[in-house]
Amino acid sequence: MAKRQFKAESKRLLDLMVNSIYTHKEIFLREIISNASDACDKLCYQALTDDAVGMSRKDFKIEIKVDKERRTLSVSDNGIGMDKEDLENNLGVIASSGSYKFKQEVGDDAKDTDVIGQFGGGFYSAFMVADHITVVTRKYGADAAWMWQSSGADGYTITECERDAVGTDIIMHIKADTDDEKYSEFLESWRLQELVRKYSDYIRFPIRMEVSKTRRKEGSPDDKPEYETYQEEETLNSMVPIWQRRKSSVKPEEYNKFYRDKFHDYADPQKVIAVSAEGAVTYKALLFIPGATPFDYYTKEYEKGLQLYSNGVLIMDKCADLLPEHFRFVRGVVDSPDLSLNISRELLQHDRQLKVIAANLEKKIKSELGKLLKDDREGYEKFWKNFGRQIKYGVVSEYGAHKDLLQDLLLFYSSTEKKPVTLAEYVSRMKEEQKFIYYAAGESLEKIDKLPQTEGLRESGTEILYFTEEVDEFCAQILHTFQDKEFRSVLDQEIEEGAEKKAEEAADAHKAVFDFVKETLGDQVKEVKASARLKSHPVCLTAGEGLSFEMEKYFQAVQPDSAIRAERILELNVEHPAFQALEAAVTADPEKAKKYATLLYDQALLIAGLPLEDPSGYTDLVCELMK
């Protein structure tokens, strides 16, 4: 029995396979089970045209056995098996895939099979946990069985042996534990069950293993019951993925249970999106919009991504490339036989297929959210409460690259409707002469309602959108227009038709007062002007072009030392008694007039939610004027 050397893909390649290509040792079991599944599929396919096989799909199975004393882990199948030539070609040449050759040979005729393997390297991943591997196999139609043995890169042997039935046994001699690695975990029943359910739950043949169970001893007394442990063979995998079933055959409670169990959520999903696509890329997807915001959603710890499967075998737990950032809240699975896998299965080549799937899913999610908005407004508002901010961030991100896709999904609170409305709904209610989509930004709905700048528009019945999140104004700036209507902040300079002319006339009539206030306040304000929009309030602050007060607050919160500051324009209501008192003081008592001017400016700061530049000075001034 001469030892044979691996062919050209020699010791260096095997070392690379074991130590570099695979990042998680636990995936070896996935690879071995996938090979067993391929073997079953090949014989199952042959049975379709060869009655002598005498087996149907329900007769095939994969078995896992553990021998702790010998430290062996065995995976057996009753699939097609291998002969000596197959062993030479498939196991004697690293990275040679018999499954890939099979798929090439049968072509479209094998569309109903689930052959997984492509590269042939998966078998050697077992050397990550085993120091010796024995393969005992007998091919369908052959009388002889063969044994392949190897301890790694030093080569392998092939000898004739006995095996009663067709199939293959992979016997892995598990390495001894080290200080860094506890290989014995792969001899524990609970760990093997965990790995099967994680990676191979949807292999379409039963994966059987004896598991330990506990039962009450027969005849033991009720007051002191005794229990015994026994072994029972159990199927570890569920076999048929729920996403492979017709949607009409799946009950809502089944989808809900799958979601809760799969993604460890206490709440049912708000919406289920089932996708089945054929064509350039064939795939199935089962997506979920969570019914509640994950507790870590707005933290750095949250990871976006969909579980990615190839023919029911888990390839990647969270494939971030399948979801755009604005839909990062979506959970789900994608299963495709068309993906180009790299040699380790763990990393996916960034190829055209993946990009096509991602683009199609983005359109599908947008479409389903649009339907939810149209058909279930209450449900959509619940979704918006949970994830609306993410949609807004999507509008703003990448310099507005996704704004056209997302703008129809936006909701903002309406001053007239007293509830969230879409931009389309706002525009449909605009007055014929109205040119702008008006909005006001503030810390809360209540505070915006009390802003002096909104009073005139609200009294005239003009609808205002209330922006209460820091991203809202950035969103409006990126959109700029909606259905050819420009966004305009009511907190900016004069916005009403003809208002500028009225303000100029008032300023001319009281020029001395405005000049006096500007001189008193100096660089604290860019300009002091008359306001045509103030009704019952004496004063307000408006921002100059470019940066609003809410944006200033945002930048200050993110970077407290930031020098970014919005231009301050002080507007005075010339018809208010406070202005009249100021005007009288300018002539009669300039020192008191300076105090009035300072007080009005501080009041404007408070109304705008901006910090006072001299809080103690403000309180002293109020107390002094009360004397």
Located regions from the model:
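GHKL/Bergerat-fold ATPase module in large chromosome/replication-associated machines
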Residues: 115, 133-155, 175-627
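GHKL (Bergerat-fold) ATPase N-terminal catalytic module, capturing the glycine-rich phosphate-binding loop
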Residues: 1-186, 194, 431
